[in-house]
């Protein structure tokens, strides 16, 4: 039997909102909680190089960002609750693999699995909230709480991560995801009714593939370039491939009726400015722990902080 929105009690709506916010909390917190584990716990235990430490942080957020829109469109087409629960299970499996990783390469691969699962949770959970809370006031409150959780989770990450590392081990920063990931999928009360979009958007696999190739190419060059050398043939080839993918993406999306990303948004100065500011802020947020590794002992005490201030 399909439950309609009108049949959902206020109590169940609250439980669903809490479940969606919890999923956002663990996904967003995982983008910062690992930062404090990099220097020096993971580096020492798994004998990681500078580039490998960067991949531990970047592969998660890269996969998460690359697949957000695809996951949202998939949820609209095949069912939001179904995709959300698949993402939750995938994220939990990735977290378990991270905690058991015997070497740095396995940890990087497990972080990729985490990012894949997280990409299915956040956009679909937001769609579920918008679907459940139909009233103008209650939807505004629900989305306001959803946005607040983002800031709270990113602030909690370094604090919780530092405590777990000191008290237990760096592996504990991944254990915390396992009990947190269980309630939304295991409780019927916290499960939202299955829903799909009335108007199906095209998934746009070509645009998605070009975007992923461009992003991965740029990140690979930035991470591996200093170690391999900027004139290394492999670096030059990947940089050229990323540039071609980016140009092809811009050309393809500008001519598509239902694009993966509507490029007209970037004509808006406020939108473009906010995007640039967000990119710079997150780059600084993720880069500070890695910079801490490079600063020699006795260096600037103001810079040698394991977490952003």
Task: Locate each region found by the language model.
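Flexible interhelical linker loops that connect adjacent transmembrane helices
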Residues: 6-7, 14, 185-212, 254-269
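Transmembrane-helix bundle of Major Facilitator Superfamily
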Residues: 2-190
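Short helix-capping/hinge motifs at transmembrane helix termini and TM-loop junctions
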Residues: 71-72, 101-102, 134, 191-194, ...
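Cytoplasmic-side transmembrane-helix entry/capping segments in multi-pass membrane proteins
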Residues: 86, 138-150, 200-210, 235, ...
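Hydrophobic/aromatic residues in alpha-helical transmembrane segments
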Residues: 34, 58, 71, 109, ...
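12-transmembrane solute porter fold
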Residues: 15-29, 34-36, 47-50, 167, ...
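C-terminal membrane-cytosol helix-exit motif in multi-pass small-molecule transporters
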Residues: 126, 178-197, 212-224, 240-256
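A membrane-interface helix-boundary motif in multi-pass transporters
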Residues: 166-178, 223-235, 303-306
